[in-house]
């Protein structure tokens, strides 16, 4: 079994027609996963037999709009999705903001990024993912804007601009930017402080899992006065396949049944997160079983069962939904 991840921003004249075609194609090949179709393009995650996925990619490439799509592939023991969904959306990634993607950041290839990091070049690695993804794993010394969802990205950029005369003290818990205490060597040794005027003149490289979010993020940064902006081509998954674990720590969160994976198919990385209950190193990620909470959390098998699938003892006490299946 294999898993593929792909996207392309391109004008789609008849999204509903494409949605129907994609559902028919994926269904005929027994593929499972999610495909989002919008006027701005296509975004998909699928799992299936290698032969069937090969046929899918071949059929997709017959459409000239998609002939140059770069697929991110991975090996899986079983299907990484439970059902097939092909949905019509306003966007192929939920952002709630419009940008001119013709003015997006330049691509930087994974091997080019590795060389920069090997040589200790002064670059800003900006993680465009959500908090729980960043917490599970990230590039060493990467900056994160404390995003609960990608929709908050414009607001966080405005916060930077609105405070361009104020430096952020990263010794406080309510910082707007996370994890800067570990970045002093990358940030010209400016101890615990960063601001808009400093950031906008630096080489910023945005990254996300597969590229679909950092493409929009890079364009938004450029619209807001950050000129030297790049995006990691193919995202974290392509970097891991080509460069291994170099300059990476932890796992990579993926939106399927695997939860978190190693970015290097040939080696395992140590978890940088802890079980919420026993506090031992762990990267097994779950959704809280309490529907009113539903947040992601990490827990080992034993503690997951003790918590009845919830993220905390409090949520366990308020659990209203039917009992969840315990892990064997």
State where each predicted segment sits:
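A short acidic-Thr-Gly-centered motif at the start of a beta-strand
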Residues: 115-119, 197
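Rhodanese-like catalytic fold shared by cysteine-dependent sulfurtransferases
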Residues: 1-104, 130-169, 183-203, 212-328
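Aromatic-flanked redox-active Cys/Sec active sites in thiol-based oxidoreductases
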Residues: 209
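Short hydrophobic beta-strand that contains or immediately precedes a catalytic carboxylate
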Residues: 124-129
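A conserved helix-loop-strand patch within extracytoplasmic ligand-binding domains
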Residues: 104-109, 117-118
């Amino acid at each position: 079994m294999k898993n593929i991840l792909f996207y392309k921003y391109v004008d789609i004249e008849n999204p509903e027609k494409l949605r129907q075609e994609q559902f028919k194609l994926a269904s005929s090949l027994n593929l499972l996963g999610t495909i989002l179709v919008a006027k701005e393009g296509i975004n998909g995650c699928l799992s299936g037999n290698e032969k069937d996925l090969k046929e899918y990619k071949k059929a997709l490439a017959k459409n000239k709009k998609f002939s140059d799509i770069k697929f991110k592939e991975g090996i899986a023991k079983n299907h990484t999705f439970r059902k097939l969904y092909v949905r019509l959306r306003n966007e192929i990634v939920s952002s709630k903001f419009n940008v001119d993607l013709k003015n997006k950041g330049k691509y930087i290839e994974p091997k080019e990024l590795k060389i920069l990091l090997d040589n200790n070049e002064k670059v800003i690695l900006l993680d465009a993912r959500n908090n729980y993804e960043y917490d599970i794993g990230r590039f060493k010394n990467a900056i994160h804007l404390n995003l609960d969802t990608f929709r908050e990205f414009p607001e966080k950029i405005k916060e930077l601009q609105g405070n361009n005369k104020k430096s952020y003290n990263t010794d406080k818990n309510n910082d707007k930017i996370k994890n800067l205490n570990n970045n002093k060597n990358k940030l010209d040794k400016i101890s615990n402080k960063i601001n808009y005027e400093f950031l906008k003149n630096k080489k910023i490289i945005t990254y996300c899992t597969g590229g679909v979010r950092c493409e929009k993020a890079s364009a938004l940064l450029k619209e807001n006065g950050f000129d030297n902006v790049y995006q990691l081509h193919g995202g974290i998954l392509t970097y891991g396949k080509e460069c291994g674990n170099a300059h990476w720590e932890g796992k990579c969160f993926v939106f399927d049944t695997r939860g978190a994976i190693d970015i290097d198919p040939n080696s395992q990385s140590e978890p940088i997160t802890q079980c919420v209950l026993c506090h031992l190193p762990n990267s097994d990620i779950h959704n809280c079983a309490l529907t009113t909470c539903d947040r992601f959390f990490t827990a080992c098998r034993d503690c997951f069962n003790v918590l009845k699938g919830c993220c905390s003892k409090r949520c366990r006490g308020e659990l209203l939904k039917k009992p969840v299946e315990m892990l064997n």
